[in-house]
Amino acid sequence: MLNTLQANGELNATHIDQMARQIADFHLQAPRVPMEHPLGTPDSVMAPVEQNFEQIRPFLSDKVDLQQLDALQAWARSSFERLQGCWKSARPMASSVSATVTFTWQRHLDRWQGSDFRLHRVQRAFPTDRRLRRHGLPGHGPGRPWLKCLARRFISQYLELTGDYEGLELLNFYKAYRALVRAKVALFSMPADADGVQRATTLRTYRNYANLAESYSAIPSRLLAITHGVSAVGKSHVAMRLVEALGAVRVRSDVERKRLFGEQQQADAGQLSTGIYDQDASAATYLRLHEIAATVLRAGFPVVLDATYLKREQRQAAAEVASQTGVPFLILDCHAPEAVIASWLEQRQAENSDPSDATLEVIKAQQASREALDAQELVHSTRVDTQAAGSMDQVIEQIRQRLPGL
């Protein structure tokens, strides 16, 4: 089981990717319920949130704890009002979810079998399904940074599979709600005749979860990064490093292109400028990338756009999104020796699991037609030698120094 893998330090990216696909497939196939359903109203979203505060408050006597709870309640109410448009436009899905395995990222992985959860509001499946609200709670504490990396990877992979980037605006609201549910459960578990030691232990657990909820109400640090380089140079790996290390959301051009236009026809296979890769399709794909980037940034998350960005006008359009949203802009200028690119391409084609259709001929054409970064772009760029293990470590450290909140 997953909790055993986690306890043994064996839980890895493959497990997370598989879980993301299983849950994404479930949500995409789940039946929908009508908007007029009693559980489909905004008020039904807020009722259990308010209930948390009402049930927690009688257990607290410390002034600092009470002040924190009041601040969290005020934030929850203001967030609920700010997100009114999201509640009304979100697509409702199944109102009952049978969960056989669910994650929690605070301290460990919990396994729930045969549990039938009645959802208070089944909005966009991503933030409101109870399983995913648990997924959103990253591992904190010494010796567990890899759990946070895996939680971030799950979020990005799930979004990539479903395309439900608009649901991100609801994520921190629900993460805070779920953290306070865990805080409440800790208080409920305290015996009525608890001694001083038991009460102190319970309050310590409560405060850990309350602090976790508070962290989700903080003003976020955001960033818009784009990759720049030919196919098979390692851009997707570079982008995923930003996901795991900084909590960015990766948006892949290959995925969004096919979400828009479907698969390339066999007759056009290997062609650089026909079918779903013609000029109009490429322009629409980059436009969609930039729309998603704006959505992710509005939700308070950093974003990395995983595309070739070989043309200057494409990069300028991305820079404009960063300017309009008031966030730093970074170009990850990806390089690798030609022999390395060729070997990675061969491996990718053999595995047949990547959405890219690029061939060696396509890559050579890209190398010949790419527009080099100009002087102004170089100011916002950093070189990444993708074959060098430590290159991205340096980039991530530079970003953290510039944006300590990440």
Report each predicted region and the residues it spans:
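ATP-dependent phospho-/nucleotidyl transfer catalytic cores
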Residues: 2-105, 109-223
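Hydrophobic anchor at the beta1->P-loop junction of P-loop NTPases
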Residues: 227
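The conserved Walker
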Residues: 231
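Conserved lysine of the Walker
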Residues: 235
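Hydrophobic positions on the alpha1 helix immediately C-terminal to the Walker A/P-loop
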Residues: 238
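Conserved substrate/cofactor phosphate-moiety recognition/catalytic segment
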Residues: 243-301, 343
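Small-molecule kinase domains that catalyze NTP-dependent phosphoryl transfer to phosphate-bearing small molecules
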Residues: 347-396, 406
